[in-house]
Regions:
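Short linear regulatory motifs enriched in tryptophan with gly/pro/ser
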Residues: 1-176
Length: 176
């Protein structure tokens, strides 16, 4: 399946809300048919975002870049050793619903947390978990943090590697 990349030691440079962030988003696990994986060994999208944009906007960019059709719950995990690290800070959707247990474990709400607030550095990685039932796990590598964004609309997908997997696999068809 898609390789989980190991990144070099983080550089000293951190970002802010004025900076431009370049992320490589890799699918590291999920309900992928073997026939699809054989044809698409690496599945990634490179996305650029401004530091004043939110994690919700990053989610929407990933959702669109991988051509997903149905929304599901998701979270970002930042500050750990990559995706699935239980020690990472979790940023979740909709903390206003009064779920005290959820609020206690979440570091923030994706709709209010801006990219520049995360404190990520170049060459760091963080996780994105989409669809808590089907468990699509992604590793997001911070490829670059530039002083300021150029003109144009952001978020912006700048590179696609591999085809977008179907959101739902027809396992009956796969067995034939």
């Amino acid at each position: 399946m898609a390789r989980q990349q190991t990144l070099k030691q983080a550089k000293v440079a951190t970002g802010s809300e004025k900076h431009l962030y370049t992320f490589e988003v890799l699918i590291v696990s999920g309900p992928l048919a073997l026939s699809f994986v054989k044809k698409n060994k690496v599945i990634s999208r490179t996305i650029q975002m401004r530091g004043d944009q939110t994690l919700e906007q990053l989610h929407q960019a990933i959702f669109s870049a991988f051509e997903r059709e149905e929304e599901h719950m998701y979270e970002f995990q930042v500050g750990g050793k990559g995706p699935m690290d239980p020690q990472a800070r979790r940023y979740e959707l909709g903390l206003d619903d009064g779920d005290a247990g959820q609020e206690a474990r979440a570091a923030g709400d994706v709709e209010r947390t801006r990219i520049g607030m995360l404190g990520v550095k170049e060459n760091e990685a963080f996780g994105y978990w989409f669809d808590f039932g089907d468990n699509w796990w992604h590793q997001i590598n911070v490829l670059a943090i530039e002083e300021k964004a150029g003109r144009g609309k952001y978020p912006k997908v700048t590179k696609r590697v591999g085809k977008s997997p179907p959101q739902y696999v027809d396992w009956d068809e796969e067995e034939e």
